[in-house]
């Protein structure tokens, strides 16, 4: 079977777990929402969660806004440091909406689980998946591909589950990234080859695949990276990362295809390195 080949030019230097819907502890959904509204911060409209401090008149402000204020935003009195134990007890019986409810998340949960859920919530804004820190774009999952097509036009896209990712000029000095897209099974995958400078000029390459999709969708796929040539073969197989979690942690933990300069030279041709990439459904 013939493989498509794309050339990736160096780009420069560098799930939300299926939360169980918790039944209302007391009363109806409407009454729970009424209770939750009592905890809204008057500044940012997020929720004031334990430990809860009030001003002398009993007004509440969330822990994020409180350090930025010099007086109570409601009564203009001193903020004070009075602990409101009664409201803390009420908070323990209220189910709070996720902060990304306006983006579509319907989960309500106790305040003790709220921060952990929001860290993994699939409705949290997605960051641009391109390596490096130059692009600060954030948006919904549906907007990621349009963003890449309009703002990162240099990235090549190949169709099919079996392609060749050709990284050019791998001998360039310093930290360098190579990126391309692969489209198959109705999804888009981003292939990344990253070169890092280590100690004493030692260089390491990290190759990984991430899905333009959620963590749950990523679990339906597997990818295989293969360096093949001169009667040698080096392979790596894994589940693609979702762009929701990114690739930084995987690279830091070497949870990807890792090889150094000497290995790269065994497979390179004229300073270019071809990586066979195969995507399959689980």
Swiss-Prot record:
Q: What is the lineage of its organism?
A: Eukaryota, Metazoa, Chordata, Craniata, Vertebrata
Q: Where in this protein does the record put region SBD?
A: 90-282
* Post-translational modification note: Phosphorylated on Ser-19 by ATM and ATR. This phosphorylation disrupts SIAH1 interaction with HIPK2, and subsequent proteasomal degradation of HIPK2.
Return the protein name.
Answer: E3 ubiquitin-protein ligase SIAH1A
Species: Mus musculus (Mouse)
Gene field: Siah1a
- Region annotation Disordered: where it falls in the sequence: 1-22
Question: Might you give the EC number(s) for this enzyme?
Answer: 2.3.2.27
Described by its record, this protein's role is as follows: E3 ubiquitin-protein ligase that mediates ubiquitination and subsequent proteasomal degradation of target proteins. E3 ubiquitin ligases accept ubiquitin from an E2 ubiquitin-conjugating enzyme in the form of a thioester and then directly transfers the ubiquitin to targeted substrates. Mediates E3 ubiquitin ligase activity either through direct binding to substrates or by functioning as the essential RING domain subunit of larger E3 complexes.
Signal peptide residues are none
């Amino acid at each position: 079977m013939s493989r498509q080949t794309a050339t990736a030019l160096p780009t420069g230097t560098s799930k939300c777990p299926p939360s169980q819907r918790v039944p209302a502890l007391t009363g109806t959904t409407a009454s729970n929402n009424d209770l939750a509204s009592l905890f809204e911060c008057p500044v940012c409209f997020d929720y004031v969660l334990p430990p809860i401090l009030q001003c002398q008149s009993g007004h509440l402000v969330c822990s994020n806004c409180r350090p930025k204020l010099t007086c109570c935003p409601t009564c203009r009195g001193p903020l004070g440091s009075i602990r409101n134990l009664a409201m803390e007890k009420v908070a323990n019986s209220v189910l709070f909406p996720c902060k990304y409810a306006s983006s579509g998340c319907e989960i309500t949960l106790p305040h003790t689980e709220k921060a952990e859920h929001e860290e993994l919530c699939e409705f949290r804004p997605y960051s641009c998946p391109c390596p490096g820190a130059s692009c600060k774009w954030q948006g919904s999952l549906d907007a990621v591909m349009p963003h890449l097509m309009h703002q990162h036009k240099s990235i090549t896209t190949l169709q099919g589950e079996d392609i060749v990712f050709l990284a050019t000029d791998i001998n360039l000095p310093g930290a360098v990234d190579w990126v391309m897209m692969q489209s198959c099974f109705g999804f888009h995958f981003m292939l990344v080859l990253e070169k890092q400078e280590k100690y004493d000029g030692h260089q390491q390459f990290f190759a990984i695949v991430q899905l333009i999709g959620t963590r749950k969708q990523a679990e339906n796929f597997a990818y295989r990276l293969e360096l093949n040539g001169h009667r040698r073969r080096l392979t790596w197989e894994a589940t693609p990362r979702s762009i929701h979690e990114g690739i930084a942690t995987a690279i830091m933990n070497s949870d990807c295809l890792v090889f150094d300069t000497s290995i790269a030279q065994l497979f390179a041709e004229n300073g270019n390195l071809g990586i066979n990439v195969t995507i399959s459904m689980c």
